[in-house]
């Protein structure tokens, strides 16, 4: 198993992606199906830390029609799909419908907890990471458990992530989606459109992995439909 994990990791890293842990589904869990129709026995999560995939994505995008919808999702599906085919797995995406419980899988695989923004807080990457897909296998692939990594939010007294948004989109009450969307699209939303979420950028952890402004602008445009 270790050899295969190393081979999968090597196949992913050429496109800036990494394995984000995994686990074996309990026998009584309603696991998703693999291509053959059988229930998957294990899942390996695929994602990114920081902006590592961005140059690879941009090179791919230059070769695609300008009208392609959801280009980052399309690129992720292609890259992870190729790896899945090479290793006899089924590739799935967070945007697949019906939606799969990716956040729950991530908690199980890496032992992370949500930040006040809902994004899982990573002890190294902070809020600057993402899950791009997963590989489902018909065999049991046992990985070491994640343990209990420190939850950095517990030690953060100031909580700047709840104090930086001009419309208080994030609070202890949750995410005010409509208020955020209206602000980003409006006349005062240029800082958010060009540099990303102010609350997310206010987080003091994992700053060396923070996405550059052009990447944050790309994600904000996708969120706001701009």
Each language-model region and where it sits:
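Non-ligating segments of multi-cofactor redox enzymes
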Residues: 1-226
């Amino acid at each position: 198993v270790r050899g295969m994990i190393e081979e999968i990791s090597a196949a992913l890293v050429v496109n800036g992606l990494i394995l984000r842990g995994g686990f074996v589904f309990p026998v009584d869990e309603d696991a998703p199906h693999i291509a053959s129709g059988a229930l998957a026995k294990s899942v390996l999560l695929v994602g990114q830390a920081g902006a590592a995939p961005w140059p690879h994505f941009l090179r791919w995008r230059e070769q695609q029609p300008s009208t392609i919808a959801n280009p980052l999702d399309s690129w992720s599906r292609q890259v992870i799909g190729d790896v899945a085919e090479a290793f006899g797995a089924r590739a799935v995406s967070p945007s697949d419908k019906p939606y799969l419980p990716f956040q729950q899988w991530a908690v199980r695989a890496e032992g992370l907890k949500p930040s006040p923004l809902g994004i899982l807080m990573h002890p190294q990457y902070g809020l600057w990471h993402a899950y791009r897909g997963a590989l489902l296998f018909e065999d049991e692939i046992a990985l070491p458990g994640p343990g209990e990594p420190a939850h950095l939010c517990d030690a953060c007294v100031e909580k700047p992530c709840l104090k930086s948004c001009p419309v208080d989109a994030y609070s202890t009450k949750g995410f005010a989606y409509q208020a955020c969307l209206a602000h980003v699209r409006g006349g005062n939303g240029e800082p958010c459109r060009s540099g990303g979420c102010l609350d997310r950028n206010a987080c003091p952890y994992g700053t060396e992995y923070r996405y550059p402004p052009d990447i944050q602008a790309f994600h904000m445009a996708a969120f706001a439909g701009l």
